[in-house]
Amino acid sequence: LKRLLWQLYRMPGRQNRQLEQRCSQLYAAWGIPQGDVNAGYLSCAVGIACSTSQKLAIRKEILQAVSEQFDTSVAAVESGIRRMVDQLEEKPTPAWLAFKADTRLGSGKPTTGKLIYAVRDVVLRQKSP
């Protein structure tokens, strides 16, 4: 399943490029520099979550597949995404605060799973150009 999900995510085509662009635009608005490896982990996880309508297990399915693609551990991927959240929470931009309000993530730090699915929902809602 993990390999299938990754293959679906990595399928060449317009939809995948649009997903990556939407994620990059969102992160840029949050103040995350382009090319940030932790943002790459999150984008990859969002792509996997977008590839199916079923709710996937965060560690066993999503983060495991991300770790395989980046040739690192699940713990490193999860820690990287958490560090990104810590950075955003330490100096929150108006765009980050608006994202949290829009997605009902609350005032505290979102969990990795909630963040993945919140980003997925936002990028899927955006209209295609």
Where does each model-flagged region fall?
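C-terminal output/effector regions of signal-responsive regulators
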Residues: N16-T72, I81, V85, E89
